[in-house]
Amino acid sequence: MKDMTQGKPLKLIICFAIPMLIGNIFQQIYNVADTVIVGRFLGESALAGVGSTGTLTYFLLALVSGMCNGAGLVVAQCFGCGNKERLAKTVTALVWVAGVLTCIMSLIGIFGAEFFLRLLSVPENVIGYSAEYLHIIYTFVFGSVIYNGCAAILNSVGDSKTPLRAVIASSVVNIAFDLFFIIVCKMGVAGAAYATILAQCTSAVICFVKVWKVRAEIGLSLMKWKPEAGYIHLVVKTGFPAAFQSCMIALGGMSVQRLVNSFGSSTMAAYVAANRVDSVAIQVIVSIGTALSVFTGQNIAKNQYDRIREALYKTLGVMVGASIFIASMVLIFRVQLMMLFLDANESGEAIGIGCTYLTIIGVAYVIAGVMQSYQNVIRGAGDVNTCMVAGLTELSGRIVFAYLLSGILGVTGIWIATPLSWSCGCIIPVIRYYSGKWKHKRLA
């Protein structure tokens, strides 16, 4: 556990972000491994089918993950001011809320898979792959939920190393079983799904064991697992804006996915592969932003606004430098990166489409870095409603720009919509920060 209320802000943020960054990259690596192995050994249609499930999976889990993130803000602020009793009651309430929501979302995912896939206009030649993958993932979704809940608690009290170890272990498990199930056992798309489930359960066990070991330090007790209505309300109140924002982002992703699907399986495969590259590349920005949010949460509990301001401005400098470096790497190696997923002889068109996507997204990483910096200060301070509005603004921009520009520029218009939506997402957090109103939104 790490106290961020003392010491040099930037050093604390970077030291906290590095394990998280490595963990996030490993988490993305096993997503990439799924994509590479499916694309190389099962073909373009299977890749498009598995890839088209991403927004659906995210949508149905967004409510639970949003609650975990919202409760994490309260945990960070309780830890910052040393209120163990309030921290423990918040965690207890989170367990009950997440448990109920997981059961509901799992049933919806299992029985509604085909309906949602047809709603997304998934082509007939890939819908079978998509449905098979979703049924397995949602039958065993509890592993992902336990990991996300425990990781949120550990990150909030300054422990980013345990989630790192969990993700590294799960990545190894995922890659090993991907190869075994798909290549050796010839299980097809089902093999990729089962490998993912085993990986998620591995990370869940590691993080749960760590939370169990430090339960006394953060005030948890086996005798106090009865939920209190006031804390259930607190978790729902703080988690709902994040959950709602996540759901809306997922809906936006589904809208964009539906638009992408209308251009055919080659475009779908290109979108899946390029998205995997983008997801890995942007983790530096995401990890530093998350660390800044935890730093803000702990320091606002002690009214240390000068430290938060110093952290923001220094983090912005790091974000800009990191964004330029990452963009350069993506632009230079974009063709080689796409060829990791797709065979140049069989999927030349898809590789070209994916390279265009990476070029447009890469040059806009600086905008994403600025957006993440301001949004995470506001989020860490507990101003969750402003974050929700900012997220909805970004989402609305993405959908509107995608549908407008695709009619003029074709699929390239969809790619351009993302950096334009990031620009929209910057406006509200920047205005809110300089208004100073976020200083009065602390949760603990």
Regions found by a protein language model. Name each.
Residues M1-A17, V75-F142, V184-F240, T296-A364, ...:
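Short alpha-helical transmembrane segments in multi-pass integral membrane proteins
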Residues C68, I136-N155, P163-S171, A192-V205, ...:
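Short runs within selected transmembrane alpha-helices of multi-pass transporters and secretion channels
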Residues I25, I29-A48, L117-E124, F180-M187, ...:
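Helix-terminus/linker motif at the lipid-water interface of multi-pass membrane proteins
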Residues C15-D34, I136, Y147, S170, ...:
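Transmembrane helical elements of multi-pass membrane transporters/channels
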Residues F59, N174-D178, A204-F208, V280-Q283, ...:
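Hydrophobic transmembrane alpha-helices of multi-pass small-molecule transporters
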